[in-house]
C-alpha cells in the first residue's frame, strides 16, 4: 500500500501542476491537517468566539452579563463553538480557504460582572480565567469543544486555542470581595486566591508601569492577578492543563502576553509540549508599536522555541497601506531586515489587524487598501492570520469597538474573494509557503516581490496608488518563459504578463490600485527543505521536516554531521520526513537531508538541540556590585547556560523586583536532574569580568522549578 500511495501522490502532483488545481490534503503530507507542528502552508482565521456566531442560545449567560441587544460591547453577545461549527458546515469558512481557526481561550472564566468607570464588564474575551481545566460555559461544554475539533478536522481545518498562563482575573489587594479575587481552580477545586495567598501562587509586587521588561514580568498586568511561575504547584498545573486541551486534538497554541512572563519558564513549558505526546505549533504575543523594534523580542523568537506574532510586519503594512505614512520602499526594508533578524521567519505569524489594535478598515474609506494588504499578507513569508470580519470590511477603533459582533457572512465581498483565490497557493506552490523574498521592482507606490523555492516561483505586484498607473520596465524574474495569468483573475485590476528567455518580463502597465499574482509550480528533483518543526527539541524527540524532492525511499537526515538512518527515520515521503533527534551536542545546529540516491539538500539553520528534559531554575547572586552601564550575566557548563562562552551568557539579569541591587536574578530553562557548574560575570563597555573563586555547583530538580542563591565571589 505504501509504494502505491507514493505513485498516486506523484501522479497527483504532476496533474495538479499541469492543470493548475489545488491538491486535497491527503496528497501532500506537509500540507495536511495532520501536520500540527508546521503551519507554513496554512492560513489562520482569528475568531473572538463570543463575537462570531451564536449557534446555541441555551448557553448564553443570564442577567447582567449578557447584552441581548448587543449595545454594551463589554458584555457577552452569545457567540459560541456551535456557531463556529455552523460556519464550517455551511461553507463560509471552508469556501474562504482558511485552514486554521484561532479561537478565544476556551477555559472557564469568571462569571462576575465588574464595573469600571460606571460600565459593566465581563470575561467575554476569555482572558479572565478561573479554571484552566474546565470550559467557558458561554462557549459550550467539553462535548461541544470536541465537536468543534472533529468538525474542523473533517473539513481539513486546524484549531488553535488562545492560552493565557500569565494571570487569572482582576483582583484588588485591599478588597478580597472585588470580583472573584483572582481565584485559581483545578477542575473545580480552589487552589488559592490573590488575597491570603499562603501557597505563593501569585506575585504581590503591585502593577507594572511597563518601564522595563523585568517590571512587566514580575508585576501585575493592570489589575490582573499575576501568576508566580517560580512555584511548583503552578508549573505542574499549567503543564497538566495544556495537556488536557492538547489531548482533545488541538493543533496549535497562541500564548498571550509572552513579554510579561519569565522567558526561562516559557522555554521550559514549550519544551515539555514538544517532548510530550501532542507536539503542536506555538506562537506568542509580544506587542510592538508602530516603528518599534525590540532586541528582546528578536532574542525571544530565536531562543525560546516559541514563534511570535509579527507585529513589526503588521505595523509597517498598516503605515504603508492604511495610513499612507510610509512608502513601499520602507515596506521592503522591513521585509528584508526581519528576514535577517529572525531565525525562523517562515514561522512568524503575519497579520494586518487583531483584537488589540484598531481595525484595518477605516470607516468611510475605500476598501482597496484592505484588499491589497490581505493580498500581500497571504503571499508573504510567514503564517498569515486574518482577523474575523476583515473580509467584511468591519471597522472599529480600539477595545471594545474592534471586537464587535460579526456583521455579515457575505461570500461576495472582494476581500473574501481575494482570500479565496490566494489562500490555496500556500498549499499548491511551495514558493509561497517556504520561499525566499526578493525585491524585483520598487518605488514609493509600487512593490514587486518574488517568492522562490527550488524551481517554483511567484511574483506579487502591488500599486497602492489609487489614481496613477505605473509603467513597469526592466522587470526580471525566475519564472520560465511563457504567459502567466493573474491568480486573482483581475479582481484587483491585475493583468497577465509575458516572460521571455532569462526571466525578462515584457514591459506592462500596472493599473492604479492594481494588484496581481503570477506563479509557477514545478516538481523538485533535488531535495529542498522548507521548514523544520518544532525548531527546538532534545534527543529522542521527533521533528518534522517539510519541503519538496525528498523522494519516496528513505535516505539520511543530518543534525550537523550526525547521520540519522534506519529506525531513526519515522517516516519518509516526498514532501515530509519525520526523524528522531539523535544524541548530539546541545546547542544550535543545522538540519539537512540526503536522498537515497545521495543528493544533498540545503541546510535548515539554527535548530536548537536541548541537553534533555527542561526545568526552570531561578539563579540569584547577592553582593554583585557594578558600575553604571555594567550588568551581571550567568554562564555555565551546559548549552542552556552558554557553555562557558561569555557571548552566549544568560542575561542581563534583573535587580529591581524579586530581588534588589546589589542582588541579581534570572529564571532560566536548564536540563532537569543535572549537576551544573556555573559562574556569574560582569559585562559592560566591552569588558568582561569573571567572578573569582571556584565554580558554583547546583543539581537541578528532576521536575518542577528550583532556586539557587549564592554570593558573588571576589
Swiss-Prot record:
Substrate binds at residues 127-128, 167, 220-223, 254, 259-260, 355, 399, 403. Residues 1-27 form the signal peptide. The record marks 356 as: Transition state stabilizer. Residues 166-229 are annotated as: B. Ca(2+) 1 binds at residues 54, 59-60, 78, 80. Residues 611-714 are annotated as: E. Binds 2 calcium ions per subunit. Residues 527-607 form the IPT/TIG domain. It catalyses: Cyclizes part of a (1->4)-alpha-D-glucan chain by formation of a (1->4)-alpha-D-glucosidic bond. One of its GO terms (molecular function) is alpha-amylase activity. The keyword Ligase does not apply. One of its GO terms (biological process) is carbohydrate metabolic process. Residues 435-523 are annotated as: C. Residues 230-434 are annotated as: A2. The active site is at residues 256, 285. May consist of two protein domains: the one in the N-terminal side cleaves the alpha-1,4-glucosidic bond in starch, and the other in the C-terminal side catalyzes other activities, including the reconstitution of an alpha-1,4-glucosidic linkage for cyclizing the maltooligosaccharide produced. This is Cyclomaltodextrin glucanotransferase. The lineage of its organism: Bacteria, Bacillati, Bacillota, Bacilli, Bacillales.
Amino acid at each position: 500500500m505504501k509504494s502505491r500511495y507514493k505513485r498516486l501522490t506523484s501522479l497527483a502532483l504532476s496533474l495538479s501542476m499541469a492543470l493548475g488545481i489545488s491538491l486535497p490534503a491527503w496528497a501532500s503530507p506537509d500540507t495536511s491537517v495532520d501536520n500540527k507542528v508546521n503551519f507554513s502552508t496554512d492560513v489562520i482565521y482569528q475568531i473572538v468566539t463570543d463575537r462570531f456566531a451564536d449557534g446555541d442560545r441555551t448557553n448564553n449567560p443570564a442577567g447582567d452579563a449578557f447584552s441581548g441587544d448587543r449595545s454594551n460591547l463589554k458584555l457577552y453577545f452569545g457567540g459560541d463553538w456551535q456557531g463556529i461549527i455552523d460556519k464550517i458546515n455551511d461553507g463560509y469558512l471552508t469556501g474562504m480557504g482558511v485552514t486554521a481557526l484561532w479561537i478565544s481561550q476556551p477555559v472557564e472564566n469568571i462569571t462576575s460582572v465588574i464595573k469600571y468607570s460606571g460600565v459593566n464588564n465581563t470575561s467575554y474575551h476569555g482572558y479572565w480565567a478561573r479554571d484552566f481545566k474546565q470550559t467557558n460555559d458561554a462557549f459550550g461544554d467539553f462535548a461541544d469543544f470536541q465537536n468543534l475539533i472533529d468538525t474542523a478536522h473533517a473539513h481539513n481545518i486546524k484549531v488553535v486555542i488562545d492560552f493565557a498562563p500569565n494571570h487569572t482575573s482582576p483582583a484588588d489587594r485591599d478588597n478580597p470581595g472585588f470580583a472573584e479575587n483572582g481565584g485559581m481552580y483545578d477542575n473545580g477545586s480552589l487552589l488559592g486566591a490573590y488575597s491570603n495567598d499562603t501557597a505563593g501562587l501569585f506575585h504581590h509586587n503591585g502593577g507594572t508601569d511597563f518601564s522595563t521588561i523585568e517590571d512587566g514580568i514580575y508585576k501585575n498586568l493592570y489589575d490582573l492577578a499575576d501568576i508566580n511561575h517560580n512555584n511548583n504547584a503552578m508549573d505542574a498545573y499549567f503543564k497538566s492543563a495544556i495537556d488536557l486541551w492538547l489531548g482533545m486534538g488541538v493543533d496549535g497554541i497562541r500564548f498571550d502576553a509572552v513579554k510579561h512572563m519569565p522567558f526561562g519558564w516559557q522555554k521550559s513549558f514549550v519544551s515539555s509540549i514538544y517532548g510530550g505526546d501532542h507536539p503542536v505549533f506555538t506562537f506568542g504575543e509580544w506587542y510592538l508599536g508602530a516603528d518599534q523594534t525590540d532586541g528582546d523580542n528578536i532574542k525571544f523568537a530565536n531562543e525560546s522555541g516559541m514563534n511570535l506574532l509579527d507585529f513589526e510586519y503588521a505595523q509597517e503594512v498598516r503605515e504603508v497601506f492604511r495610513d499612507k505614512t510610509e512608502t513601499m520602499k520602507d515596506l521592503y526594508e522591513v521585509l528584508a531586515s526581519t528576514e535577517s533578524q529572525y531565525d525562523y521567519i517562515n514561522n512568524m505569524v503575519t497579520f494586518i489587524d487583531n483584537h488589540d489594535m484598531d481595525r484595518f478598515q477605516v470607516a468611510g474609506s475605500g476598501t482597496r487598501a484592505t484588499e491589497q494588504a490581505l493580498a500581500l499578507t497571504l503571499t508573504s513569508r510567514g503564517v498569515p492570520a486574518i482577523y474575523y470580519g476583515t473580509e467584511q470590511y468591519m471597522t472599529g477603533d480600539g477595545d471594545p469597538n474592534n471586537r464587535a459582533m460579526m456583521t455579515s457572512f457575505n461570500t461576495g465581498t472582494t476581500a473574501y474573494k481575494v482570500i479565496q483565490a490566494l489562500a490555496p497557493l500556500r498549499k499548491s506552490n511551495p514558493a509561497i509557503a517556504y520561499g525566499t523574498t526578493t525585491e524585483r521592482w520598487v518605488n514609493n507606490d509600487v512593490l514587486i516581490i518574488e517568492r522562490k523555492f527550488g524551481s517554483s516561483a511567484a511574483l506579487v505586484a502591488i500599486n497602492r496608488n489609487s489614481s496613477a498607473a505605473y509603467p513597469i520596465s526592466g522587470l526580471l524574474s525566475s519564472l520560465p518563459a511563457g504567459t502567466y495569468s493573474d491568480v486573482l483573475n483581475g479582481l484587483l485590476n491585475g493583468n497577465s504578463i509575458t516572460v521571455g528567455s532569462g526571466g525578462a518580463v515584457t514591459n506592462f502597465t500596472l493599473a492604479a490600485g492594481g494588484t496581481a499574482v503570477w506563479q509557477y509550480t514545478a516538481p523538485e528533483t533535488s531535495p529542498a527543505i522548507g521548514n523544520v518543526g518544532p525548531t527546538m527539541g532534545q534527543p529522542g524527540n521527533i521533528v518534522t521536516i517539510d519541503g519538496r524532492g525528498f523522494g519516496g525511499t528513505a535516505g539520511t537526515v543530518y543534525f550537523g554531521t550526525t547521520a540519522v538512518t534506519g529506525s531513526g527515520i519515522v517516516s519518509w515521503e516526498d514532501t515530509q520526513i519525520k526523524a528522531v533527534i539523535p544524541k548530539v551536542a546541545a546547542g544550535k545546529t543545522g538540519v539537512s537531508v540526503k536522498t537515497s540516491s545521495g543528493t544533498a539538500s540545503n541546510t535548515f539553520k539554527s535548530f536548537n538541540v536541548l541537553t534533555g528534559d527542561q526545568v526552570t531554575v531561578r539563579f540569584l547572586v547577592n553582593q554583585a556590585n557594578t558600575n553604571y552601564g555594567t550588568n551581571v550575566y550567568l554562564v555555565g557548563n551546559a548549552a542552556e547556560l552558554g557553555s562557558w562562552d561569555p557571548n552566549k551568557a544568560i542575561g542581563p539579569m534583573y535587580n529591581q523586583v524579586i530581588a534588589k541591587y546589589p542582588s541579581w536574578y534570572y529564571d532560566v530553562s536548564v536540563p532537569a536532574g543535572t549537576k551544573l557548574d556555573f559562574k556569574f560575570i560582569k559585562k559592560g563597555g566591552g569588558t568582561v569580568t569573571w567572578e573569582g573563586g571556584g565554580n558554583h555547583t547546583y543539581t537541578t530538580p528532576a521536575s518542577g522549578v528550583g532556586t539557587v542563591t549564592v554570593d558573588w565571589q571576589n
